[in-house]
UniProtKB/Swiss-Prot annotation:
Protein name stated in the entry: Chitin synthase 6
Region (Actin-binding): 655-679
Transmembrane feature ranges: 886-906, 925-945, 1201-1221, 1596-1616, 1622-1642, 1649-1669
SMART domains: Cyt-b5, MYSc
Principal EC category: transferase
UniProt similarity note: In the N-terminal section; belongs to the TRAFAC class myosin-kinesin ATPase superfamily. Myosin family.
Residues reported to bind ATP: 104-111
This enzyme's EC code(s): 2.4.1.16
Amino acid sequence: MAMNLPPLAGSGGAHTQPSLPALPAHLQSDTHLTAHLASRFHLSLPTAQLSSHALISLNTYTSSSKGPDGGKEGSAMAGAEEMAERAWLRLGHRSENQAVVFLGESGSGKSTLRSHLLASLLNKSSTPLSTKVSLAAYVFDTLTTTKTATTPTASKAGLFYELQYDTASTTNPVLIGGKLLDHRLERSRIADVPTGERNFHVLYYLLAGTSPAEKAHLGLEDSAVQQRRWKYLGHPTQLKVGINDAEGFQVFKNALKKLEFPRSEIAEICQILASVLHIGQLEFESSANTQVTGDDSGGFSHEGATVVTAAKNKDVLAIIAAFLGVNAQDLQNTLSYKTKMIHKERVTVMLDPNGARSHANELARTIYSLLVTYIIESINQRLCAADDAVANTISIIDFPGFEQQASTKSALDQLLNNSATEALYNLTLQNFFDRKADMLENEEVSVAATSYFDNSDAVRGLLKPGNGLLSILDDQSRRHRTDIQFLESMRKRFEGKNPAITAGSSTAKLPGSNFLTENSAPIFTVKHFAGEVDYQVKGLTEENGEVISGDLLNMINSTKSEFVARLFGQDALQTVTHPKERSTVMQATISSKPMRTPSVMSRKTARTARNQRVLQQKAAEEELEKLSENNSQAGGAAKAAASEQGASGQFLAALDNVTKAVADPSTNSYFVFCLKPNDRRIASQFDSKCVRTQVQTFGIAEISQRLRSADFSLFLPFGEFLGLADAETILMGSERERVEMVVEDKRWPSNEVRIGSTGVFVSERCWMEIAHLSEASLAHGRFGLPSDGGDGLTPHGASPADPFAASKERLLSTGNTPLMYGEKGKNGYFGANDGSDSRSEAGVSAFGGGDMFKNFDTREQMAERGNEKSLVEVEEYRDSASRKRWLFMVYLLTWFIPDFLIRFIGRMPRKDVRMAWREKLAINLIIWLSCLLAAFFIVVFPMLICPRQHVYSAAELSAYDGSSGSPGAYVSIRGYVFDLEKFAPRHYPPNLVSTEDILEYAGKDATSLFPVQVSALCQGRAGSIDPAVLIDYRSTNVTGSPTLISQQDINANFHDFRYFTNDTRKDWYFQQMAMLRANYLKGRIGYSPKYMKTLARNSRTIVSMNGRVFDLTEYVVGGRRTVGEDGKDISGVAEDSYDFMEPDVVTLFRQLSGADATRHWASLNLSEQAKTRMLTCLNNLFYVGDVDTRSSVRCKFAEYLVLAISIMLVTIIAFKFFAALQFGTKNMPENLDKFIMCQIPAYTEDEDSLRRAIDSAARMHYDDKRKLLVVICDGMIVGQGNDRSTPRIVLDILGVSETVDPEPLSFESLGEGLKQHNMGKVYSGLYEVQGHIVPFLVVVKVGKPSEVSRPGNRGKRDSQMVIMRFLNRVHYNLAMSPLELEMYHQIRNIIGVNPTFYEFMFQIDADTVVAPDSATRMVSAFLDDTRLIAVCGETALTNAKSSFITMIQVYEYWISHNLTKAFESLFGSVTCLPGCFSMYRIRAAETGKPLFVSREIVEAYATIRVDTLHMKNLLHLGEDRYLTTLLLKFHNKYKTKYIFRAHAWTIAPDSWAVFMSQRRRWINSTVHNLIELIPMAQLCGFCCFSMRFIVFVDLLSTVLQPVTMAYIVYLIVMVIRSPDVVPVTAFILIAAVFGLQAIIFILRRKWEMIGWMVLYILAIPVFSFGLPLYSFWYMDDFNWGNTRVVAGEKGKKIIVTDEGKFDPASIPRKKWEEYQGEIWEAQTVRDDARSEVSGFSYATKGHPGVQVGVSEYGGYSRPGSIAGGFSGAHAMPPLPMNTSRMSLAASEMGGNRASQFGGSQYFSPEDMVGLPSDDALLAEIREILRTADLMTVTKKGIKQELERRFGVPLDAKRAYINSATEALLSGQL
């Protein structure tokens, strides 16, 4: 049949033809079609059609609603509406499911056309639900769209939007629901915003649209914003790109309200969005965590602090914690650590700042993704109809456009996005080329083949289930394979098999190298339909896992926010629980597929005419129901499998749902090809090359060619066709013939109709024509139901201007331009239908206006609620009497501080913390008071005894003569000393006497220059004196030094204003003296009592009263005269004026000359008025100075008191010096045969430190067979800078294969609540290093399955307790925990030494290196003195020169050992044995009595309740010192010593923060431990020679260190001020201290110590002043944990904790004999177990043919590390899963062991024939042991010797031989 195409429409030319297939054949090439599109584009006709199947739309970047005439006709909007009309008609008239698939690059306008299509479809519905469905789409776009370089509204999540209809009753479908299915949100964008792009719009909306009050609540204040850049929002310019974010936020909130979200939930959503923004603001830094906890572990380098990552901006952290409802500290800890699964082991990685930043990004991505999922699921719950009510659906499919380059750094997002685009394009090709091929063939209709680009290879390669690329990626990720392994797997799968996928090389040659190395940037290439794309392999498998750390989830489990709990309780969060602890979440992933699947495509109809379609739809329904069940069934195997799927697997499953739903036979699909006219987003510019590339990419020319030959959209059976055609009038012929007549009559083109054998294939146009649904009906919407407001989503009279996708588009505009999915008027999102849906207002009425947080809790209240803990009671106790007394004293000292001030100002809500603060304050007050008393005693007390006198003797005054070298220029006037040097420049008048002349009087008595008017200064006996009376003055200085100035001095006349002169000024002298005393007084002339007596003997009348000295000599000898006004002597002056002094006073002075007359003055028979007058006269006329008491006895006592203190201190130092003088030859000790354990606790040290410590211990010159390395790994932690966990590092060093994986066993630990239950793994074997082969035992604390963060970590003290408790139970024969039984087994049966044989415990830290002879020297000391219980050696620094901080510590370390510890060692009581280098006696040599592991010590050291300040300082600050205290306390008959010849080297803190924290620990620990020691009466010695006295001195010196520094400063000041002999002597004594120290290191030839001593002296202010004050004040700086004490009834105290209550019965315990008995009953002892007497076993070496020893616990023991050895796993059959464990019930202990270890065989009675009897065997065994070397004999060797002697195989007797050997060796037989 000839193809008759319709003529070109109109007469306007080819460009008026909208349908591309209608163009002539010669115009069907890519170039011609592009030209055709260009011609239409330039006429404002941006659309074209591919028949009725597809719409081609070009983005004009201006308006999507403007046609050529300015109206809607011809616009993209009109094209979308026409397609909506077609879908609507097909849905209503044929009850078919409809699907509209959008294809196009980013920026091509897909989102805009989608919104037009959706608006048009919703406009057809009369149901009020349509508004909500529209709003749901807006909410989805707000959450998932962003601005990119190509478009301001780029979709970043795949959308499958399903509109649900009931089509049963009418041809007008009824909208009954909607379903949003989101596919793979681009989560990587949250924390990685590409340059020039934005994050998701909602975050900007929140920032711009909230009110000031809301911003304040959310922490988004403008003032704060101006000072910071929001890291998650990209460059600040992205906040101002023409998008109306504020308006968008209001629309978003209103949309949520209309969708019935409660007001509180909308507010919570905003809080979560704000928390996402704040997470981006978090800044991290590496800091030293100086806050002490019980979990601290490690060596000296860890003692001061643990290097952790902390948040810089705590305020931001607090906001996030408040909104998430968690504790801020917990949040910081969670972000600083990350728990991972590495090789089936759960480890916690200590993150550096970059790692913490990544972890915070993970939290932000998780929160945002869950929020989006929650909102979408909540919308679906409100909109989605029940499946059985849905007849048909219209589905809108819009996935993000193809990406040539990843916009974010996520290769996974790019791969999945492009895979989806590939699948949708393949779906398009199938629809046009292959969909009806089978039906055409069955109907015997032939269609000419059309060539086209088939992307099936790429689709199969990417999406094929099982072995497609995404499936391979998912499989490799699930199996924890590396990226290179994934690349190799992909190569094996696709190389030579699929041309679309090419795997790159995994190796590469570095420049300048000829050797292949691993490729650092491997790629694989996929040939997509849109071009080749290279994908980075690096990090792809890890990213595909999308693992959310269990730390985050466990933190969220404690949230107090119900909303956050709901977010994390969604099914979208797929958790992985521990197989043995289902309540423990190990990790989780967020689903990359929707929570729901497409609805079942069914139609409720009973029309018999459509039975065939009904059957087809039922088949489709069954298929999709199976698909739905497989993806949604809860709790079954399918869900378990899904939970193991990674992102690619989940996305693949979801994409498969989409493609099957669209490709279903009952679904009619439409396609929208969106094209960009140019790449630069320039309006009205058509780039032919750009468009032609897109036309070629989508194969539009091939599709058009196909439609020219076969444009079939429907298949109508003959009967249905004839019914539609009203062909009843044609009565003749068969149905086929009648159909042919109708077709011929219609004259349809051959490409639109074909007649088959049973029906007719027709195009949609033909169907509409025959169904009387004319094309005109599409334009007028005749078959739709118009709303009362027009289209329902467009305002009345709105301008048709509809921005397409430019910066003015919809919500991006600020004026009257339309919003995003509807106009800004009342009929936009909130159109005319709003009022008809009462449900949509349910959430609105409650919302109100203004601040959405108005009735919300404040951030502070949220934070307080987040800090609350759920507590349970764990213990009840009463305070001791001493504790009560102490608390009474505390309150007595701190009563003035009210409790509420500590609570609110100090922010200490917990009572126990407040009490500790009070205790700290009380202790500080006591210390400060002690310091003040010491300072008072040293400084003030001497001054009280001898107050400082400002007096100068005559000789001293003469020294101040102003000459060069003199201290100054002083002059005396009537007993007062003045500063002449200061006065001379101010002499008045200045020109009369020169300054040089004035200074000539320096050092002299200038009294003669100042004549006095007697009557003005003295009232005499009568109350007045005649002014003519004069009195002479003569110096009392009989030696003549200072010289008395003559009265005839040339300058004397200038000061003479007496009565007889022309210029009389009677008060001039008094005034001048007052002025001089006020301004220039330096002191007084001093007369010692001795000098006064000398003067008296020289006929001087000189007396002292009240410390003042008066000289009446001139008065007594008559040195008075009277001079009148004319200057001549006169007579007749009254006697009482001439003899103006009372005779009694004169007599008193004569009689007491040279003595003190104070007491006699009081008894004078004179009136008080007379005494007052006489005293005035004495002070003004006869005063010559003060009594000089500086040489008195009390003043000498005060001076020598300082000297006495110095002598006492130096005496103690001298004793220490003599104690340190230990000389002798350095002899090498002999070889010793004592068994020692060397314990090394490991925490987060690096491999180098651990290797140095382990190797140094292994290489010690001590018999390798008699030392055991015991390494305790404190938790599964990866330290900063490490690539493996610490246990893995240790095991790698020791040579333990990763295949060796013993099962964890329970044991008791030191912790709060349930943390007392811990689990550990035990490894053992031989370690070979530099010729040494040393047995080792490794205990790895792995924690219970419920522990997520830092599993197993309990601290260094707990690590010590693992061994101490084990040995305690061994020696006391107590029941042991499963871990201890395993340790016993490994030591006794694998290593071959009975644990009781070990006599000494050698403890070193993991950062300590010991000298080769250290253990030998220590053991020698123990052997020399059986009363020695513990020793320590000298510890030096390995990092001495790394910083100034370490340099100042070198000398201090050396001197603290060689002076302090050596001195204490004299008394046998070293009070601090450092845990980094000490050895302890485990049991007494003679009696075997436990010492170091005695019951008292173990119980005291294992104290768990550490809730007081004192106990925390003892057990958390200095556990090593406290352990020493316990040894001295409970074993007071034994001694502790310092061995100066044993050496070790450790690492010291090299930063101030860590150094200060370490010293805070040491100082406070010292104080509290010494307080523990002082009450002990057992300390050796007597009186001051006792250690108790030295302990007291040590305590006092520790407390008074600040005063020591102040004392030194005081001495310096004294020397500067008065360099006399006393303070100089004190300095000499102090210098002697360092001199003695210098003698020690000089005698020991430690010359380098000279330099270190200088640095130490410079740092004395730090050591003696700064550190003690800092330490004392921060004595309570602990992490107090969650255990606290509350008041109970009747004075009892109740301990509560949030860690739960520990039940000791949860850890089963058995004695070793019981356990071994059960083992022996079930199996025979293995061949290669050695006698414990031999002390050494080679069973673990794993030589060929030798079975490796295996733990009776079911786990393999560690095979030896000897080269050529083999793993025990290969020597043994695999253990069954039901192997008995000690962690099970006690009744299960020892069960199921008969054949699980390969050790025993079963023999029939026939096997026993001909064998020797047991008695014969016993006799021979006894004979063999009598002559054999017990150090080399083995049980296997005994069996072989017996077989040789008896000549028969003795396998059947193996059990008896082994048990008999054991019994003989142990003495039981």
